[in-house]
């Protein structure tokens, strides 16, 4: 199965990409209520990699270059008539990339989403091969209302984010905040640092509502996704009538 993946690396370092021993991370993560629960002993821990994700097909891509930014729009579709749009914007004056994910129901029946990622990154670290033990550090910020963020750094192995001997069971760390307090327990931020190659991938969510970040690993590659808190974590779902469209917050 062909999978469209977003792989971000520092400028000029693409020649050092070595990863070919892990599954590609789909560009968009989504789950519908009619989907079966995730496999690989991961039920109740994650809603990623649903049957819906496995049926997504590439439907085209455009790139527009402006004076101040580059906008790359990628289209995906699935057999139920859902059309997904992933918009990646790279700004000339900002080192951060912006991702916007939306879905439109082009079919004749209503469908209910119970998870939709705002962004997802995978194959971390693309500069490593094999398990690469003790080289991935996870950075999070613990905080609450009217408090300073406290940096917590843990090895991926300390969070049980390492594959089994057969790379079958999937492990996940899902965290965030439920309710209108965007910071209650954690700041909507997470970073994965490759200490062997001096590269860090960091992401932040921006909505003032329930949110989540999720670290996921089944094989040698680590994935990081985030956005709206899903149905399991934040009791969220969204029904799309025929012709309706929904855009996940940044």
PLM regions: where:
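Short Pro-Gly-centered flexible turn/kink motifs
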Residues: 238-250
């Amino acid at each position: 199965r062909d999978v469209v993946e977003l792989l971000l690396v520092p400028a000029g370092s693409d020649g050092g990409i070595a990863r070919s021993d892990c599954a590609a991370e789909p560009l968009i993560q989504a789950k519908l209520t009619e989907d079966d629960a995730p496999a690989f002993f991961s039920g109740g821990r994650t809603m990623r990699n649903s049957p819906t994700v496995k049926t997504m097909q590439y439907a085209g891509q455009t790139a527009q270059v402006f004076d101040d930014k580059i906008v790359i729009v990628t289209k995906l579709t699935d057999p139920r008539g859902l059309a997904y749009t992933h918009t990646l914007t790279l700004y000339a004056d900002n080192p951060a990339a912006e991702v916007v994910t939306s879905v439109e129901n082009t079919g004749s029946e209503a469908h209910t989403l119970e998870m939709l990622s705002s962004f997802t990154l995978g194959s971390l670290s693309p500069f490593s091969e094999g398990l690469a033990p003790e080289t991935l550090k996870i950075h999070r910020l613990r905080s609450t209302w009217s408090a300073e963020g406290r940096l917590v750094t843990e090895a991926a192995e300390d969070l049980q984010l390492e594959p089994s001997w057969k790379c079958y069971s999937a492990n996940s760390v899902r965290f965030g905040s439920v309710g209108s307090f965007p910071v209650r327990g954690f700041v909507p931020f997470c970073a994965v640092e490759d200490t062997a190659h001096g590269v860090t991938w960091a992401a932040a969510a921006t909505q003032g509502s329930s949110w989540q970040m999720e670290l996921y690993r089944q094989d040698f590659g680590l994935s990081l996704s985030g956005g709206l808190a899903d149905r399991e974590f934040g009791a969220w779902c969204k029904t799309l009538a025929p012709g309706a469209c929904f855009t996940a917050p940044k």
